[in-house]
Curated annotation (Swiss-Prot):
Pfam families: Kazal_1. CDD domains: KAZAL_FS. Disulfide bonds join C6-C36, C14-C33, C22-C54. GO terms for cellular component: extracellular space. The record marks L16, E17 as: Reactive bond 3. Avian ovomucoid consists of three homologous, tandem Kazal family inhibitory domains. One of its GO terms (molecular function) is serine-type endopeptidase inhibitor activity. It is found in: Secreted. Glycans are attached at N43. This is Ovomucoid. The keyword Repeat applies. Residues 4-54 form the Kazal-like domain.
């Protein structure tokens, strides 16, 4: 199972780094920061499906 450490988030601003992750909502997040912010907003219901595009 793929996992991402979101302990340093949320962050007010994310970089434009392009390292896509696919969320359990079948949405592509451009990088870990964007994904982690979304995870925290979802109260933990969003999880990582896999690294790379969906």
């Amino acid at each position: 199972l793929a996992a991402v450490d979101c302990s340093e988030h949320p962050k007010p601003a994310c970089t434009l780094e392009d390292r896509p992750l696919c969320g359990s909502d079948n949405k592509i997040y451009s990088n870990k920061c964007d994904f982690c912010n979304a995870v925290l907003e979802s109260n933990g219901t969003l999880t990582l499906s896999h690294f790379g595009k969906c």
